[in-house]
């Protein structure tokens, strides 16, 4: 579509998972929708993410194992008195409905991980499985030429320059020389990828976040929902206190569009806005973020001009340990260490004094918090992940693949430091040799007994899930013994905003007095997270993003159907 219509029912800003869910829901409900994306690609940070969606008590949960009450208890335990009970209740009630609605009316398909504990597995209300959904792999060839509109994942999460793999695929690839079933799976993957590259710039079999946004985008195209790329809203229009439309800029042209039911803000949050980063995030944080570069607080600025305001937390973002490496084109790769290395047996995280500072198998958010605490003591220092040759052969390390596939290049460009002895490694890392030797010796004793006497690594279900089930006595603790030894620098990285626009349970943006602004909604990282800076499980950003996008669209539909500006009720 090349022209901006003069009027729609609902205008959605931002084509990530939250925005596309809002647009798709509105279209299914019969509204005239326009989806605007300021970049030339759809998907946002969702396209780079793992694609996990935290939805308790959905149709994919094992029967009888979960409930609204159990999930609410868990959130109350995990978030504490910071929990916005009204919005949390709306999320828990509506998230299963959102899944049903999308699967019944669109090309969106989910499946539950067979086993995936909540991150704070020892808390009351936590579950071992059923809450974490992932998108079913998607064949993007059905998009035809519109496949080019889809934002690719981070290059470091693809093999051979363009093949996406999920955890199941990785297991088969690593076991291809030991199991005939894994060998066959690997051959199918490679054959499919080779065929795809004859037609496309990358593999068309999409998994994780790319599969999720691919399915949402395909569903929008199937319903002929107009999606305008490289288009930006510069201001929101008001009439008697109600949002009525926006001024839209596309190329050199500017026009006004009326939005009868309102506007949904889903522009990605503030993670790439320099001034807000300095104001809201720790001073020790640099620009290490895998969030898309377009997340520059557009929704915040638009909302603030019409009365909205930012709600802050003691932790205004979500964290992960990241490593950095300069790409061949000069750009900086930022690799989040989520699940593939740090929780496996034989990885140690050390501070600039050569000592452990964290349970390596804890959640990536808590690991990030530990990095900040450590760097407050060593403001000019660098923390490292270290391992031995056995580890890197079996599990890889950061951007280094298992089997040492690209190890030589990583050593050559300085991403990985290697040494034959602990003393030599200490010298190369500028840490005290006696401290490092003592740290490794203690951890090697823990590997023998299976009990981490310092941090309790491997003592809950989530941590053991990150480990290697074939390793004992503790799946998360292994010795560092076989040279050469390896290390890479790790830093705290932000993976998405927690602070956001204050909203009510219907996803309506609130003004500074707490009243909803008629016709203005927010979801995703534009909305203040219901988790208030805590990270209870995988998918706690995408799950609420999609759910509140669904809530916003449904509320807008009901408002318009009533034919008046005041909804007067919940979603």
Where are these regions (language model features)?
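A conserved beta-strand/loop element that lines the FAD pocket in flavoprotein oxidoreductases
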Residues: 220-234, 313
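Conserved N-terminal/central alpha/beta ligand/cofactor-binding core
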Residues: 38-226, 346-349, 356, 362, ...
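Glycine-rich loop(s) and the adjacent beta-strand/alpha-helix scaffold that form part
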Residues: 203-210, 222, 250-328, 507, ...
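An anion/pyrophosphate-binding glycine-rich loop and adjacent beta-alpha core
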Residues: 121, 127-129, 134-184, 300-302, ...
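Beta1/beta-strand and adjacent pyrophosphate-binding region of the FAD-binding site
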Residues: 4-18, 34
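Extreme N-terminal leader/targeting segments of oxidoreductases
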Residues: 1-10, 28, 210, 214, ...
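A glycine-rich dinucleotide-binding beta-alpha-beta segment and adjacent secondary-structure elements
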Residues: 235-243, 435-530, 534
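Internal hydrophobic alpha-helix adjacent to the cofactor/substrate pocket in enzyme cavities
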Residues: 302-309, 437, 544-564
């Amino acid at each position: 579509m090349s022209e901006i219509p003069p009027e729609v029912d609902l205008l959605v800003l931002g084509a990530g998972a939250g925005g596309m869910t809002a647009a798709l829901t509105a279209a299914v409900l019969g509204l005239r929708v326009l989806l605007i994306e300021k970049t030339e690609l759809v998907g946002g940070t969702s396209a780079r993410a793992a694609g996990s969606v935290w939805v308790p008590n959905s149709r994919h949960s094992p029967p009888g194992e979960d409930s609204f009450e159990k999930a609410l208890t868990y959130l109350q335990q995990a978030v504490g008195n910071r929990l916005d009970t009204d919005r949390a209740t709306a999320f828990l009630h509506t998230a299963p409905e959102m899944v049903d609605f999308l699967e019944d009316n669109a090309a969106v398909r989910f499946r539950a991980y067979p086993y995936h504990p909540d991150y704070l597995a020892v808390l009351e209300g936590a579950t071992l499985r059923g809450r974490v959904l992932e998108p079913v792999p998607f064949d993007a060839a059905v998009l035809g030429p519109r496949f080019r509109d889809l934002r690719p994942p981070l290059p470091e999460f693809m093999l051979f320059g363009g093949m996406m793999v999920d955890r199941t695929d990785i297991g088969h690839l690593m076991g291809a020389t030991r199991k005939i079933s894994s060998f066959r799976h690997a051959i199918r993957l490679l054959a499919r990828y080779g065929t795809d590259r004859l037609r496309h710039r990358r593999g068309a079999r999409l998994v994780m976040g790319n599969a999720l946004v691919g399915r949402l985008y395909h569903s929008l195209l199937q319903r002929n929902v107009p999606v305008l790329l490289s288009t930006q809203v510069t201001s929101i229009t008001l009439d008697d206190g109600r949002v009525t439309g926006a001024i839209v800029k596309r190329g050199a042209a500017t026009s006004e569009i009326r939005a009868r039911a309102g506007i949904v803000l889903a522009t990605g949050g503030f993670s790439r806005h320099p001034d807000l980063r300095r104001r809201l995030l720790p001073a020790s944080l640099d620009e290490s973020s895998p969030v898309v570069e377009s997340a520059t607080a557009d929704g915040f600025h638009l909302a603030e001009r019409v009365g909205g305001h930012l709600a802050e937390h003691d932790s205004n973002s979500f964290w992960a340990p990241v490593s950095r490496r300069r790409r061949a084109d000069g750009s900086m790769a930022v690799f989040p260490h989520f699940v593939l290395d740090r929780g496996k047996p034989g990885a140690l995280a050390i501070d600039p004094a050569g000592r452990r500072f964290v349970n390596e198998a804890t959640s990536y958010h808590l690991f990030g918090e530990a990095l900040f605490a450590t760097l407050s003591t060593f403001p000019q220092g660098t923390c490292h992940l270290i391992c031995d040759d056995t580890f890197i052969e079996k599990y890889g390390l950061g951007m280094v693949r298992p089997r040492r596939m690209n190890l030589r290049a990583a050593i050559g460009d300085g991403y990985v430091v290697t040494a034959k002895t602990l003393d030599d490694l200490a010298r190369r890392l500028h840490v005290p040799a006696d401290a490092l030797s003592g740290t490794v010796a203690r951890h090697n004793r823990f590997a023998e007994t299976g009990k981490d006497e310092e941090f309790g690594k491997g003592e809950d279900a989530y941590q053991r899930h990150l480990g290697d089930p074939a390793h004992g006595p503790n799946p998360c603790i292994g010795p560092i013994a076989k040279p050469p030894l390896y290390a890479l620098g790790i830093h705290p990285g932000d993976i998405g905003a927690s602070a956001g626009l204050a909203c009510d349970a219907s996803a309506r943006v609130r003004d500074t007095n707490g009243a909803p602004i008629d016709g203005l909604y927010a979801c995703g990282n534009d909305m203040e997270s219901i988790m208030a800076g805590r990270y209870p499980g995988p998918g706690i950003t995408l799950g609420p993003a999609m759910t509140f996008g669904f809530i916003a669209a449904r509320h807008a539909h009901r408002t318009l159907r009533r034919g008046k500006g005041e909804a007067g009720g919940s979603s």
